[in-house]
Amino acid sequence: MLTQKPKGTNDLFPPEVFLWEEIERKFREVCRRFGYQEIRTPIFEHTELFERGVGETTDIVEKEMYTFLDKAGRSITLRPEGTAAVIRAYVEAKKYADPGPAKYFYIGPMFRYDKPQAGRLRQFHQLGVEILGSDEPMVDAEVILMALEFYREIGLNDVELRLNSVGCPECRKSLREKLINYFEERKEELCDLCKARLNRNPLRILDCKNESCQKIAQNAPTPLSELCPDCREHFTEVRKYLDLAQVKYVIDPFLVRGLDYYTKTAFEFVVPEIGAQSSIGGGGRYNGLIREIGGPDQPGIGFALGEERTILALKRKSEEISVPVPDLFVCLLGEEAREYGFPLINELRRLNLWVETDYQGKSLKAQLKAANRLKAKAALIIGEEELKSGRFILRDLDTGEQVELSRDELIEKYARERGKDNA
């Protein structure tokens, strides 16, 4: 066990980790174009935060959380999702008093004790955003548009948007009663989990993946059928802005998401080609969550995109994201060359170059072989003859062409290419 990673976790090595870096870089770029700033919260919180925020009757709270007592006897939970922690930080720091709306993004690991499979791990990573302080339908549409823009940036152009409105607490009063009556008559056909949900959270039955439950739910009342006038108008406006932006979507009346805090707009991003875990992200509005966690009655909306599932979708589509390679491999031949080259390499790195070298005193042939294995763009050769002449060989490893340069000419060349005048 000492050398085995825990079940449901992954180790990332190059070049795989370069793909993650590129995805996170592009997500940050998109977030900043839309005016979002990064927030970082602890990976563990007081358990009560998730019980109240996510909902005590959700699958996450009931059976998927990593919860333990710390040495002071306090119940602590590794975060199973990002929204509740962001809201807690927002309320604790009284950021709600600042001119709004507040716009945050986050990138990081989440933890759920779930059955590991492709696209579903016990430690997984999310790219998320939250915008707090606005109930405008245009904000809902912009948040959705932002996620789709990120997918477009990384090459996922055929992501399907599924859209619904789950209404407000007032809407759901009548819906809850109708759902209980409907499913009570068909209770024996429900799975055991949905039987338990029936009187506690009947809305979740609409989202059950059990085939029998799905068949029964086809004719059940849905949130869309019970929307109050305000929620209906809000949903109409959200769709209007999506239409103006020429965003394609599918209305899914059974989409309710897995968290209790959602109100009004709910959405998911789906790539059917990746199989059972076809949902690669989703989100929605949560207008009561800030108040529930102890803040003022402010609205909010956000999304979380699964990083592992996004990468799985990219790989299934054979989309390639460029992997960085060294700019230069410096071949140092002999101790004198090593002493001369050591500070030179540092100077080159200060020009923002990725520079590799040999540390073991290998032959020129072996060093050039190492440079090619790393796919370095060029090799700089410094040996006894080069030190005597003061001119070093710079070889393009793609074309084989080479030139002789002095130290100053070498620095000037790379400074010019990097847009720096360090000559």
From Swiss-Prot:
GO terms for biological process: histidyl-tRNA aminoacylation. Pfam families: HGTP_anticodon (PF03129), tRNA-synt_His (PF13393). Keywords: Aminoacyl-tRNA synthetase, ATP-binding, Cytoplasm, Ligase, Nucleotide-binding, Protein biosynthesis. One of its GO terms (cellular component) is cytoplasm. NCBIfam families: hisS. Belongs to the class-II aminoacyl-tRNA synthetase family. This is Histidine--tRNA ligase. It comes from Carboxydothermus hydrogenoformans (strain ATCC BAA-161 / DSM 6008 / Z-2901).
